[in-house]
C-alpha cells in the first residue's frame, strides 16, 4: 500500500491525493500552516488521515515554539465537519499538558490508526459473505487513513480471508474520490472492482447486483452520520431494496455530545462543480451549491463497524 503520509527529519510528507491516480507525489510540510493548507486543499483527506495530519501539524508548531492553543484553533478551522480533526488536536493538547512531546503523540496516533483500522476490518469481515458484491461511496480506504482503511479496510480484510468479493465504486462527484482513489486502491490489491456514476447506484441495487453497502464517516452521532455528499441517496436506495447499509468508522469519529443535524456542513468552491480538468462544463457565472457532506439518519443504518465491534445505531 502507498503511504498516505510519513514523518521524517522533523518534516511531514503528505501524499498529494489531488494528483492520483496518475501521479504519485509527496508534499513536504515544514510548518503547521503547510499542514493546514494540505488539509484545506484536500491533498490529504479522509477523517482519520486528517486527524493524524493535524497531530503532526501540532508537532511542527511545537518544534517552532508556537503557542499550542492558538495553532490548535487554527488547525481545527481547516475543515469543520471531520470530528477526528478536533479530537486529534484536543488529544495532543491534553497529552502535551501532561509532559509528552507533540511529536511522540503524533507518531503514536499514526501507529494506533493503522491498528484500529485492522481491527475494524476484522469485525467487518464477519458480515461479508463469499461471493458478495459490495457498493461503496467516496474513499474510506488506506488513503483516507494512516493506512489500511475503514470501509475499504473491511473489503481488504475479506479479500485477505480469501473470500470471493466484487466491489462497486461510485465515482463520487465532484472531486471523484471513488473514481480516482477507491478504484485505484482496489486495483492495487487486485480486488475485482467496477466504477459507476453516482446516479447508477440505485439502478444497480434495483437490478439485484448489490449485496451490501459499506461507507465511511466523517462524524458519527447518536442520530446518524455525516459522510461525503451522495451518501444519503445511496442509503435511501439501500433501504428501498432491503440491502444492508453499514458504516465503518473508528471511535474517534464519534461525537457523543451533539446531534448529527448540528454538524456544520462544509461548503466548497463552485469551481469543483463547474470545472473538470480545469475546463468549465457550465457557464462561469452559474449559481452553484457544493456541500461536501450530507446526513444519513440512524434508521437507514444497519450497523456501525468500529474497533470495538459492530454497534447498532441508536
From Swiss-Prot:
Pfam families hit by this protein: IF-2B
Site entry (Transition state stabilizer), positions: 138
Reactions catalysed according to its record: 5-(methylsulfanyl)-alpha-D-ribose 1-phosphate = 5-(methylsulfanyl)-D-ribulose 1-phosphate
InterPro entries, alphabetized: IF-2B-related, IF-M1Pi, IF_2B-like_C, Initiation_fac_2B_a/b/d, M1Pi_N, NagB/RpiA_transferase-like
UniProt GO BP: L-methionine salvage from methylthioadenosine
Entry EC number(s): 5.3.1.23
Coiled coil: none
Enzyme class: isomerase
Amino-acid positions noted as binding substrate in the UniProt annotation, renumbered to this chain: 45-47, 79, 177, 227-228
Entry keywords, A to Z: Amino-acid biosynthesis, Isomerase, Methionine biosynthesis
Active site: 218
PANTHER family xref list: METHYLTHIORIBOSE-1-PHOSPHATE ISOMERASE
Summary of the function given for this chain in its UniProt record: Catalyzes the interconversion of methylthioribose-1-phosphate (MTR-1-P) into methylthioribulose-1-phosphate (MTRu-1-P).
Entry similarity comment: Belongs to the eIF-2B alpha/beta/delta subunits family. MtnA subfamily.
Protein name per the record: Putative methylthioribose-1-phosphate isomerase
Organism, scientific name: Methanosphaera stadtmanae (strain ATCC 43021 / DSM 3091 / JCM 11832 / MCB-3)
Lineage of source species: Archaea, Methanobacteriati, Methanobacteriota, Methanomada group, Methanobacteria
Amino acid at each position: 500500500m502507498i503511504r498516505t503520509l510519513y514523518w521524517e527529519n522533523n518534516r511531514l510528507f503528505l501524499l498529494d491525493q489531488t494528483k492520483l491516480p496518475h501521479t504519485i507525489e509527496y508534499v513536504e510540510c515544514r510548518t503547521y500552516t503547510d499542514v493546514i493548507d494540505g488539509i484545506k486543499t484536500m491533498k490529504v483527506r479522509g477523517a482519520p488521515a486528517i486527524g493524524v495530519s493535524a497531530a503532526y501539524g501540532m508537532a511542527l508548531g511545537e518544534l517552532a515554539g508556537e503557542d499550542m492553543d492558538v495553532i490548535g484553533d487554527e488547525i481545527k478551522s481547516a475543515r469543520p465537519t471531520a470530528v477526528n480533526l478536533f479530537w486529534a488536536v484536543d488529544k495532543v493538547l491534553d497529552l502535551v499538558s501532561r509532559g509528552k512531546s507533540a511529536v511522540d503523540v503524533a507518531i503514536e496516533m499514526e501507529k494506533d490508526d493503522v491498528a484500529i483500522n485492522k481491527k475494524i476490518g476484522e469485525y467487518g469481515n464477519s458480515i461479508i459473505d463469499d461471493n458478495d458484491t459490495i457498493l461503496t461511496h467516496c474513499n474510506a480506504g488506506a488513503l483516507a487513513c494512516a493506512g489500511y482503511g475503514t470501509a475499504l479496510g473491511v473489503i481488504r480484510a475479506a479479500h485477505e480471508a480469501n473470500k470471493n468479493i466484487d466491489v462497486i465504486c461510485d465515482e463520487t462527484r465532484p472531486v471523484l474520490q471513488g473514481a480516482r482513489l477507491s478504484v485505484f486502491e482496489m486495483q492495487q490489491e487486485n480486488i475485482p472492482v467496477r466504477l459507476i456514476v453516482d446516479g447508477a447506484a440505485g439502478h444497480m441495487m434495483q437490478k439485484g447486483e448489490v449485496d451490501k453497502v459499506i461507507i465511511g464517516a466523517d462524524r458519527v452521532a447518536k442520530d446518524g452520520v455525516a459522510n461525503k455528499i451522495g451518501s444519503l441517496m445511496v442509503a435511501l436506495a439501500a433501504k428501498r431494496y432491503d440491502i444492508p447499509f453499514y458504516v465503518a468508522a473508528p471511535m474517534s469519529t464519534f461525537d457523543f455530545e451533539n446531534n448529527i443535524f448540528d454538524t456544520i456542513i462544509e461548503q466548497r468552491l463552485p469551481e469543483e462543480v463547474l470545472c473538470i480538468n480545469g475546463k468549465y462544463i457550465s457557464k462561469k457565472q452559474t449559481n452553484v451549491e457544493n456541500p461536501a457532506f450530507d446526513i444519513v439518519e440512524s434508521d437507514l443504518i444497519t450497523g456501525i463497524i468500529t474497533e470495538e465491534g459492530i454497534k447498532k445505531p441508536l
